[in-house]
Amino acid sequence: MSTPNEPEKPGIIDAFKSLKMSDFAHMVHHPCFKESLITSVVCGLGVGCIHLFLRAPISRAANWGFGTYFGMSIVSWEGCNYRKQLETNNFNIKITEAAEKTPKHRSSRSAQEIDEGFNE
C-alpha cells in the first residue's frame, strides 16, 4: 500500500486503459509479429488436428488447439524479442571494440609534412 507522499503505482486496468487502436495497427510492423503468428497458428492447428485424429471430441480438440496457439504465441514472441536483444547487444559490443581499435591520431606529422615527404 502506498503512503500519502508516494504516487500510486499503475495497475493492469490502467495499462489496458492506456492502449489505443493505433498500438494494434502498428503491431504488424514489429519484427517478431510475423514469426510469432505463423509459429502459433501452425502449432495450434497441429495440436488440434492431432487431438481430432485421436478421436477426441471437437470441443476438446478446439480447446487444445486454441490453448496451444495462445501459449506458443507468447513463447515465440518472447523468444524472438530475446534473440533481437542479444543481437543488438552483440552489435553494440562489436561497434565499441572496433572504435577502441581505431587509432585516434593516425599520424603525428601534419598533412603538409607528409606531402613534402612525397615530393622529395
From Swiss-Prot:
Assigned GO CC terms: mitochondrial inner membrane; mitochondrion
Keywords (A to Z) from UniProt: Membrane, Mitochondrion, Mitochondrion inner membrane, Transit peptide, Transmembrane, Transmembrane helix
Biological process, per Gene Ontology: mitochondrial cytochrome c oxidase assembly
Pfam families xrefs: Cox20
Mitochondrial matrix topological domain: 55-120
InterPro entries, A to Z: Cox20
Membrane-spanning segments: 37-54
Compartment list: Mitochondrion inner membrane
Transmembrane is among the record's keywords: yes
Residue segments, region Disordered: 98-120
This protein's record includes keyword Mitochondrion: yes
Membrane topology: Single-pass membrane protein
Role this protein plays: Involved in the assembly of the cytochrome oxidase complex. Required for the maturation and subsequent assembly of the mitochondrially encoded cox2, the precursor of subunit 2 of cytochrome oxidase.
Name of the protein described by the UniProt record: Cytochrome c oxidase assembly protein cox20, mitochondrial
Species of provenance: Schizosaccharomyces pombe (strain 972 / ATCC 24843) (Fission yeast)
Phylogenetic lineage: Eukaryota, Fungi, Dikarya, Ascomycota, Taphrinomycotina
Name of the gene encoding the protein in the UniProt record: cox20
